[in-house]
Amino acid sequence: MVLSGEGTATPKLADGQVEAIRVIKIARNTAVKAHTTAMITLKAVLVTAPDDLREQLEPLTDHQLILACAELDRSGNIADPAVAIRHSLASLARRYLDLHEEIRIHSNHLKQLTTAAAPQMLERFGVGFDTAAEMLITAGDNTDRVRSEAAFAKLCGACPIPAGSGKTSGRHRLNRGGNRQANAALYRVVIVRMRWHPPTIAYVERRTAEGLSKKDIIRCLKRFVARELYQLLPEPSNPPEAQIAA
């Protein structure tokens, strides 16, 4: 439909603060993945380390392990496996620390940008800067392109899909479409609220008594959160004027 010129959907604009949030979040997400990979790889290398080094490092916490590995002596003949392992552990640990600092910088930028773009959204229970960023990215800079909260829920993959048949009615199933990152963000909000938010806890108890499964209750709650957050999206005609330092 898009290539034929017959599409009716309004495309996202990429000229505002939400686009800045999107590209910063891409950098942060890739850094987080690399950060996790560095720790997993370091522990895998440690398994094959010499016994004395492994016995020294294995009891440490993750934070202590990273700091200890970063200070390992890397001098010696690199052809010696023991030296090569120390070199590898030190390199992975320093990479982990560098990525940790990079993630901190990206997170600070995202917090500032989302606070400037949608401060009311961040005040809602269970909504952090990462969730707010996903909601803003899903809607785009021109939030008026999403005509209704139902359309926004569909974008987030949170709208109900009828699953009835000739023998059943009123049943729905999970929506596997939409923006899966936004759907995951809604899921995190719901899980937090199911544990700590009294109105949500009461809702879960009531719906459970009515015979709904936990999966169906979560589906209903994601739809509610999508409706709630849609109403807090910023107006496209009034972009924030806050200046964010790089």
Question: Could you describe each region identified by the protein language model?
Answer:
Residues 208-245:
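Basic, amphipathic alpha-helical segments enriched in Lys/Arg and hydrophobic/aromatic residues
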Residues 45, 185, 189, 224-232:
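Amphipathic alpha-helical segments in well-ordered regions
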Residues 20-120:
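Glycine-rich, often acidic, oxyanion-interacting loops/wings at catalytic, nucleic-acid
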Residues 1-15, 19, 60-71, 168-177:
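Short alpha-helix plus adjacent loop in nuclease-associated cores
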